[in-house]
Amino acid sequence: MLTWKNNLTPVSEQFDDIYFSPENGLEETKHVFIKGNDLYNRWRNWNIQNAFCILELGFGTGLNFLTTWKEYLEYKDRFRLHFISIEKFPLNREEISKALSIFSELVEIKKEFLSSYQDLIPGMNYFQFLGGKIHFSLFLGDVSSALCEISGKVDAIFLDGFAPSKNPEMWDKSVLENLKYVSKKGTTLSTFTVARMVRDSLSFSGFKLEKRPGFGRKREMLIGSYSDSFLESNPKEKPWCKRAYPELQIKTVAIVGAGIAGTTLAYSLSRRGIQVFLIDPSGIAKETSGIPMAISHPHLTKIPGPISLFTLRAFRYALSFLSSFADQNFFEKTGLFHSVTQEMDSERLQKGIENHKLSEEIVFWKPIASKFQNGDFLENEPGVFFRNGFWTRPESIAKKCAEQPGVEFIKGTASRIEQDGTSWKLLIQESGHEIVANSIIFCNSHSIGKLIASLFEGEEPFPIRKVRGQLISLKETEKSSRISNILCAEHYLTPSILGEHILGSTFDEFDLNPLPQKKDTDRLLEFVQNKYPSLNFDSSCVLIEKVGLRAQTPDRLPILGPVFDPREFRKIYKEIDLPKNRNKKFPNLKTIQGLYVFGGLGSRGILSSFLGSEIMASLILGEPVPVESSVLEHLHPARFLYRKVRK
């Protein structure tokens, strides 16, 4: 709850403290945090590939972030900026807008920021601004748990919670000591407070500290730098999925597979200045990614779990990304209504909203007999409504991603890989041409493990299976043309786009026939006729039948991360060495430098690909990733073998 001092300076009622100096909050930010971390000088001399990464404890009104954004503009053509902030009690858009209204210098930046500051979820929220030059990760939650969820190292730290006497939880000894897990040699920090307990905790963590003149009425402030050359590992990261940082600068990457995973990854990497070779024997999005339309919404579970946590994060980033990337011809936020089904029963859906602490801005429960915008045929349908559920045309998105400068498409089959010093060679079968790159990423759907297996005596370490799906397009009827939202139950129906609906999709693990089958068309028609009889669909409405073979993992989450040797894994983590005692020390899993996989997206290819590509790009470059380490663990390629060995 906010009050206002002189109707200008925001004050927290909970902590009885101001958010920034009433004298000049913007100049205070520059003095304490920008100059306190020597950012102008460091930015002038920043000549490495990686983003400059800042961690802030206490987002508040966003003043520090927006001021940093403004000061960074002079350097935007030289490097990227990644700003990570933690906030337990986030302000809403109206409060932030009013709080920052006194700073005329920030008007345009504030406007751009607030246009994306929506659909927030507990935990990590990831944004991009300035055409991908600024990455922003906002963690909503407790600071002590948030610090253990950051996977990666930062270059500077802003400590800006309310005063230690007002908000002791943020300045707790354990919180400050955990800063070593996100620090590396040369990481700097600054803060407005010089309290003894703060200095002692930071010194104990490995920071060399120095007092400096404070801002305004504050006599002193504190600066520091991390002096330990040893990189402390996050104790929450398990040995088999610890981060492996690149040993060399990454300049060239070869991506095998030009579906939605490969093309979105090519886009993410090329925007980071990396030359990308995109290789596929068929062309851009010519296999399963070539479906005419895909729909997206988060997957709600009764209690938060790996699938719901990942899909919520992926959904909100996909919305943010597509809103600036796509045009109305291949992306539209129509809203999505999901009816109660046997699998998605009312308790699961309602408890899912409650237990994930989701606002009505994202999803709400619609009880029976409530009015709804899609007309009378839905008035007796209970379910949930995702306000920003959307449809896309995957092939159009894939092609636009592949047109990004720095992406070279090569039509051909990758037939052999071999290591060449610190690089990798990849042979193109048709031309005999060899591509040399610092890294290779395999994004080729259910063929993802075939080339990799040649390195491991024929063993494919990734359990990906084919799952057949068939969809049909339907000519609109007079009644169906009035549908404004995507309708979901056991299957889904899109609104009419240019006179045509998409009705999908079947799910068959046993029949892998690549051709459309009448029995599946009949099954889909039977569903829509029984579920929405007043729409008057019949077999004469069928226009197109399309089949795709999804690449599905056993846990229905993507496989995303570094390649490892399964033989070495079993040697290290033998069954007899996996005790119940979690405190026993194990060696970290050694991954194969320069080889990565990104696949197994299943029926959530569009939903997973945008955030998945950003995670992959961060892993390849050794930067902080835009999801929690606990979420990242459930995407790691070694997770299936680990579970198997544990048995």
Curated annotation (Swiss-Prot):
Family: In the N-terminal section; belongs to the methyltransferase superfamily. tRNA (mnm(5)s(2)U34)-methyltransferase family.
GO BP term, example: tRNA wobble base modification
A Pfam cross-reference name: Methyltransf_30
Reaction catalyzed: 5-aminomethyl-2-thiouridine(34) in tRNA + S-adenosyl-L-methionine = 5-methylaminomethyl-2-thiouridine(34) in tRNA + S-adenosyl-L-homocysteine + H(+)
Name under which the protein is recorded: tRNA 5-methylaminomethyl-2-thiouridine biosynthesis bifunctional protein MnmC
Alphabetized InterPro entries for the sequence: FAD-dep_OxRdtase, FAD/NAD-bd_sf, MnmC-like_methylTransf, SAM-dependent_MTases_sf, tRNA_MAMT_biosynth_bifunc_MnmC, tRNA_MNMC2, tRNA_S-uridine_synth_MnmC_C
GO cellular component, one term: cytoplasm
Enzyme Commission number, as recorded: 2.1.1.61, 1.5.-.-
Domain of life: Bacteria
Role: Catalyzes the last two steps in the biosynthesis of 5-methylaminomethyl-2-thiouridine (mnm(5)s(2)U) at the wobble position (U34) in tRNA. Catalyzes the FAD-dependent demodification of cmnm(5)s(2)U34 to nm(5)s(2)U34, followed by the transfer of a methyl group from S-adenosyl-L-methionine to nm(5)s(2)U34, to form mnm(5)s(2)U34.
Keywords, ordered alphabetically: Cytoplasm, FAD, Flavoprotein, Methyltransferase, Multifunctional enzyme, Oxidoreductase, S-adenosyl-L-methionine, Transferase, tRNA processing
Lineage: Bacteria, Pseudomonadati, Spirochaetota, Spirochaetia, Leptospirales
Subcellular location, record wording: Cytoplasm
Cofactor: FAD
Species assigned in the record: Leptospira interrogans serogroup Icterohaemorrhagiae serovar Lai (strain 56601)
GO-annotated molecular function: flavin adenine dinucleotide binding; oxidoreductase activity, acting on the CH-NH group of donors; tRNA (5-methylaminomethyl-2-thiouridylate)(34)-methyltransferase activity
Region entry FAD-dependent cmnm(5)s(2)U34 oxidoreductase, spans: 256-647
Region named tRNA (mnm(5)s(2)U34)-methyltransferase: 1-227
